Amino acid sequence: MIGGFLGAGKTTAVGKLAARLAAQGLRVGVITNDQGRNLVDTAMLRSQGFATEEISGGCFCCRFNSLVEAAHKLTEQSRPQVFITEPVGSCTDLVATVTYPLRRLYGGEFTVAPVSVLVDPIRALRVFGLEEGGSFSENVLYIYLKQLEEADLIVISKCDLLDEARLGSLRAAIAARFPGKEVLAVSPRDGINLDAWFAKIASEEQAAGKAMAVDYAVYADGEALLGWLNCTVVLSAKKAFDADRFLKELAGEVQTRLRAEGAEVAHLKMTLSPEGGLGEIGVVNLVRNDFVPELSMSLEEPVEEGQLIINLRAEAAPALLGRVVRQSVEGAASAVPGLDAQLDHLEHFRPGKPTPTHRFEGVTA
């Protein structure tokens, strides 16, 4: 399981790990997770050729039976030797509610590797008070810190964004808050330390232990502070247009409007899939209010028609997210002559109170 808060780089890391395992001759199955439907992560991973199942409508802990069913479905279809699971970025207590139940109830089917929790280094520097910048309310940060507390391995992703001094300060802050935790710094984009990380989680089993204490009232309030939006947009133009540029400009529109409303972005990610394409997609990410929208996958050729998927998570009212996305789609589309953008599906909501299917206080070796 590769966890971490929204925008930590989980999907990129999952793709890199899946590719590495596949190159070693292993069959890989991926299971993604979201509170809503139409998940960008699923589209990204399927476009890379990985057998992928999606659990929507709740986190793994609340949809535990669906997680097991997804694993069985992948087993029937492609017989994976390794499953990689990516939980919802706003969820915690996954050891007690997911990995321990898997070990206790399905230990004959699955061996559980150490749980990695990724952190975006810039976000982490702000959370630990080392640098100034936008952050979240106290109860949202409760979830963030609980994710780190339950990690078997804390992984500082995107370490290429920090120099040695800043990385050292972050390591020291994590060690002071969570003494004894193993910490790795990696960069999926540049390939830094991926071999060491992947070798560890591919060769070791999660240690036995006791579950951490979690205040579910605070946890539920923290989740409820986050607005969630998923939508799909059908694009049709009279003349082929630059899809990568459109994605970046649309992300910029959303960013500007949310910043004006004082809403902190947790993660915005969008995919554009050309009509009649061969699996190629364009992907743009935005992980903070002051972050420059970044393309993680590009479309080399201009596009005339396609489908846009938008996943937005921010500390803001869901209705505000809906209004911002509608206005931003209209604004970005109007800048492209002859482009028609029709909202096909839009849902915005706050996550419900987490109610785990199981919660085990611990497992023995």
Q: Where in the sequence are the language-model features?
A:
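Nucleotide-state-sensitive switch-loop elements of NTP-binding domains
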Residues: M1-G3, A8, T12-Y142
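P-loop NTP-binding site
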Residues: M1-G3, G7-T12, S203-A365
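Non-catalytic alpha-helical coupling and interface elements of nucleotide-dependent molecular machines
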Residues: L26, E76-R79, R103, G107, ...
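A structural preference for short, hydrophobic beta-strand core positions in alpha/beta folds
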Residues: V30, V183-V186, L343-H345
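A short acidic, often aromatic-flanked loop/helix-cap motif at beta-alpha or helix-coil junctions
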Residues: C59-C62, R189-L194, G277, F349-K353
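Short acidic, S/G/P-rich loop/turn micro-motifs used as interaction or catalytic elements
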Residues: S90-C91, R123-L125, L161-L162, A240, ...
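Residues at alpha-helix caps and immediate loop-helix transition turns in enzyme cores, especially N-
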Residues: L94-V98, R166-L170, D242, L321-V325
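Canonical P-loop GTPase G-domain recognition
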Residues: L141-E223
